[in-house]
Structure formats: C-alpha cells, structure tokens
C-alpha cells in the first residue's frame, strides 16, 4: 500500500492483441443483442423481472462464459477484457450487467481461484454455457463483510457436511444452480472458523425466497436462499477447511473490476445523453451548452469517468500480471467508481 508500481503504469497497460480481437467480437455481439432492447429493459424494470427467454439469449451469446478458461468452453477473458465487456453491457442495462457480473465476478470466482481440478472439470463447462448460473452466498441478516458474524453452520458427518442457515440479498438467487456458500465450521478462542462450499440447487434442502422488490436493478434476481440440513459432499468444499474468510475476501477483491467496468459504461451513457440534451435545449435564444454551469457539470462528469477508467485499468493490470496483494487498490477503485457514478 502506498507504493506505485512503475512497471504497471509505464507503459500504460495494453491488452494482448489476441484478447483484444476476441473482445471486439464480443462487443459487437453485445451491441447486436442489446442495442435495440431499450423498451424491453424499461418494461422488465417496471415489472421487476427478467424473462427466462432473455436469459436464454444471454446463454446463446456466450455471456456467461466470459472468464471461464477456453479449456472448459469459455472465452478465457482476463480482468481487463472482462471489465471492458461489462462496460459495454452496462451502457444498455444495469440489471443485465449485474446478472452477468454476479455470475462471473463473484458467483463462480471462488471455483476459478481455489477449485480443485476435479471441481473445475465438474462445474466449469456448465458454468461457461450458462447451463448453470452462479451466485455468491455470503450475506446474512446480521453479517456481510463482517463474515465473522455468520450464523450459517456446517457440521461434518463422514464424507458430508450438514449445512443449515439463511442467506440474504443474494444476486441471481432465483435463477442460480450453483452457489458459493460460506458457513461456520468451528471456533478457536472465541473466533469462528469459516469454510466455503459449492452447493447446487438440486441438493435436498435448498430453497429460495421470493424476488425482492428493489428500488433499482429491479429486473435482476435478488432473493433469500435457505439451506435446511443440506448434505454437501466433502468433495464440494472449496479451498482449505477454515480458510473461508480469506477466500471470501479474495473473491470480492478479484471481482471488483467487473463492478468498475459497469460503472464506466453507465457513466459514458449518461455523458452521451447529457451532452445530447445540452446541444438540443435552448433558453434565451442560445443552447444551454454555452452556460458556464453546464460546461462545468459536463466537464466534471468526463473527468470522473476518465479517472475511474484509469483506476479500473490499473487494478485489472495488477490482477492480470499476477500481483498477489491488490486489496487496497481494488477497494479504492470500487469506492471511487461507485461514487463517481452517483455524482454523474
């Protein structure tokens, strides 16, 4: 923290040519799929639901396999290309970006980072095609980033873990088949041990609550998820036993470039809409773009967007270059990006 890695910034991060070529194809596909759907997005937002038929279109266009390695049927995007893709998606609809992002940024990220070869062989091909959609199940009524307050518990019985508890505000909860779940598996000196598990929807005892009626992102699925004495095979334990807190933090840090990319896309869309209106709107015989306050507002929007894109690019380069400690930088990019979008 506090050290500027010159080799990351000079020269400025550049995407590999082969990945850039694939990215351009994906962006063209996103424009083709989403470019004429504005009326649909508005309707779905009012209804608070994304139709299953449209989710199937996302599958067909390969948007659930962005970060899955090519060996398992995905596109193998690194963080920079992934963030750029979510930037494009978010220009059209935030609920769609969140659905894809929750799947790739956090839902299955633990499998990519900590999964065994057997686990990857078992799940990644289905996650790449969207046959399985992923969700990240950490938050509870009294616990979120404070993972130590988790009440969901898992007790080992032979080759299985008996998992019980309730998770809250789980993005993709209503459509997910694959859950990365965090539970207490013991204590040491009053401090809880947390372990991560892969839980699938078809396991007896897994159920979801109704779709949450949210203020925004209404078409994305957000639900409670309930685990009632779910018997999870020991083979589905993700990473090491009692190392779940570190796993959760690693997932969240690694996935934050996706959120940053989405905010950039939203900001660019807002800037385009604002400048269009400023050019068209006239008062007292002249365009409002000529007023100093309007110039200042639009200028600040562009500055914030530029700075956000630079921060997200830097964090993506840290991740893609193999740096192990980028937690502070990832957190900064998330806070700055979300606040910049709010100001915009």
Label every model-predicted segment.
Residues 32, 62, 217, 324, ...:
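Alpha-helix capping/hinge segments and adjacent helical runs
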Residues 142-145, 169-172, 186-188, 214-221:
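Short Gly/Pro-enriched turn/cap motifs at secondary-structure boundaries
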Residues 164-208:
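A short core secondary-structure module
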Residues 146-164:
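Cytochrome P450 C-terminal beta-domain/meander region
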Residues 42-45, 305-336:
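C-terminal helix-coil-helix/basic helical segment that borders enzyme active sites and/or dimer interfaces
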Residues 270-274, 304-314, 340, 344:
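Amphipathic, well-ordered alpha-helical segments in soluble domains
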Residues 1-101, 109-133, 142-145, 156-157, ...:
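Amphipathic, small/basic residue-rich leader segments at the start of a protein or domain
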Residues 207-306, 335:
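Glycine-rich beta->alpha junctions and the first turn(s) of the following alpha-helix
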């Amino acid at each position: 923290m506090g050290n500027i890695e010159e080799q990351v910034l000079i020269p400025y991060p550049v995407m590999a040519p082969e990945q850039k070529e694939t990215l351009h194809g994906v962006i063209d596909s996103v424009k083709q799929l989403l470019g004429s759907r504005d009326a649909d997005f508005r309707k779905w937002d009012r209804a608070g639901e994304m139709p299953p038929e449209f989710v199937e279109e996302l599958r067909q266009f390969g948007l659930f396999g962005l970060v899955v390695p090519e060996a398992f049927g995905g596109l193998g995007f690194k963080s920079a290309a992934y963030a750029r893709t979510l930037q494009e998606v978010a220009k059209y609809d935030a609920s769609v970006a969140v659905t894809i992002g929750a799947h790739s940024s956090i839902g299955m990220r633990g499998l990519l980072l900590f999964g065994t070869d057997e686990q990857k062989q078992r799940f990644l091909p289905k996650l790449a095609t969207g046959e399985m959609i992923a969700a990240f199940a950490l938050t509870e009524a009294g616990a979120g980033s404070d993972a130590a307050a988790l009440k969901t518990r898992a007790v080992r019985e032979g080759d299985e873990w008996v998992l019980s508890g309730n998770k809250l505000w789980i993005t993709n909860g209503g459509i997910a088949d694959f859950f990365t779940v965090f539970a207490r598996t013991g204590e040491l000196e009053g401090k809880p041990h947390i372990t991560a598990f892969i839980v699938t929807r078809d396991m007896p005892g897994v159920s979801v609550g109704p779709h949450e009626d949210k203020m925004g992102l209404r078409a994305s699925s957000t639900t409670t998820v309930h685990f009632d004495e779910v018997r999870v095979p020991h083979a589905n334990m993700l990473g090491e036993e009692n190392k779940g807190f570190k796993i959760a933090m690693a997932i969240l840090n690694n996935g934050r470039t996706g959120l940053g990319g989405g905010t950039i896309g939203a900001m660019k869309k807002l800037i385009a809409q604002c400048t269009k209106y400023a050019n068209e709107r006239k008062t007292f015989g002249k365009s409002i773009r000529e007023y100093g306050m309007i110039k200042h507002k639009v200028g600040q929007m562009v500055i914030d967007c530029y700075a956000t894109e630079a921060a997200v690019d830097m964090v993506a380069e840290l991740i893609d270059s193999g740096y192990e400690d980028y937690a502070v930088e990832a957190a900064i990019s998330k806070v700055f990006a979300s606040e910049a979008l709010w100001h915009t």
